[in-house]
Swiss-Prot record:
InterPro entries: Ribosomal_uS2, Ribosomal_uS2_bac/mit/plastid, Ribosomal_uS2_CS, Ribosomal_uS2_flav_dom_sf
Keyword Transmembrane helix belongs to the record: no
Gene Ontology MF terms in the entry: structural constituent of ribosome
Protein family: Belongs to the universal ribosomal protein uS2 family.
Species this protein is from: Actinobacillus succinogenes (strain ATCC 55618 / DSM 22257 / CCUG 43843 / 130Z)
Name of the featured protein: Small ribosomal subunit protein uS2
Pfam families in the record: Ribosomal_S2
Taxonomy of the source species: Bacteria, Pseudomonadati, Pseudomonadota, Gammaproteobacteria, Pasteurellales
GO process terms (BP): translation
A GO-annotated cellular component: cytosolic small ribosomal subunit
UniProt keyword list: Ribonucleoprotein, Ribosomal protein
Gene encoding the protein: rpsB
Length: 241
């Protein structure tokens, strides 16, 4: 079972919140106190909440659910992509385009355009174009890949989103809320836990903390997928007998 320990969280600096003057009073239940003008997250609250969230991610993956990892701030961007790829899930790590979930129909058309351009770049179509046309299409493809590359194979809305930084990704959270998609989020002391189904109180800026959250989440998803695949194989064997 994918879990994190208190020691791992301390080593990663999960307990370091923001300066006290930037705090959100709604995070009071999760704050241990302050040190040198910085709020300290109560890891005794975070630990069970995080492990509960991991268990739920495993359950969703076990039911063949799709998880969308969201983290567009610089400190999270590359790690978000790596974690999603590692557990064969989906990600948005550059910029959240308004309507990415709530206007999925339009997003799907943009994904189709991206895939068409990818095909054209590989089947020789680009070579038949003028230099300018080929360059324009290459630029369009690169732009679409940056925005939609992590969700181009998602084929429909996700079953949950895992967010690094509730405050920073509030638009993504609002869209998920509107559609009834469960939200898992790292919530720092300057953010609001409102509208987050699985609150994980902790530092959302430190690279080591972000890496810890994502590694654990990816492990939980892989565990669920492995169990689901084992069940599928068992059914296939029984059907073949």
């Amino acid at each position: 079972m994918a879990q994190v320990s208190m020691r791992e969280m301390i080593n990663a600096g999960v307990h370091f919140g923001h300066q006290t003057r930037y705090w959100n009073p709604k995070m009071k239940p999760f704050i241990f106190g302050a040190r040198n003008g910085v709020h300290i997250v109560n890891l005794e609250k975070t630990l069970p909440l995080f492990n509960e969230a991991l268990a739920e991610l495993t359950r969703i993956a076990n039911n063949n659910g799709k998880i969308l990892f969201v983290g567009t701030k610089r400190a999270a961007s590359e790690a978000v992509k790596a974690a999603a790829v590692d557990c064969q899930q989906f990600y948005v790590n550059h910029r959240w385009l308004g309507g990415m979930l709530t206007n999925w129909k339009t997003v799907r058309q943009s994904i189709k355009r991206l895939k068409d351009l990818e095909t054209q770049s590989q089947d020789g179509t680009f070579e038949k174009l003028t230099k300018k046309e080929a360059l324009d299409r290459s630029r369009e493809m690169a732009k679409l890949e940056l925005s939609l590359g992590g969700i181009k194979d998602m084929a429909g809305l996700p079953d949950a989103i895992f967010v690094i930084g509730a405050d920073y990704e509030h638009i993504a959270i609002k869209e998920a809320n509107n559609l009834g998609i469960p939200v898992f989020a790292i919530v720092d002391t300057n953010s609001s836990p409102d509208n987050v189904d699985f609150v994980i109180p902790g530092n959302d800026d430190a690279t080591r903390a972000i890496q810890l959250y994502l590694t654990a989440a990816a492990a939980a998803v892989k565990e669920g997928r492995k169990a689901e695949q084992a069940v599928e194989e068992k059914f296939s064997e029984e059907a073949a007998e």
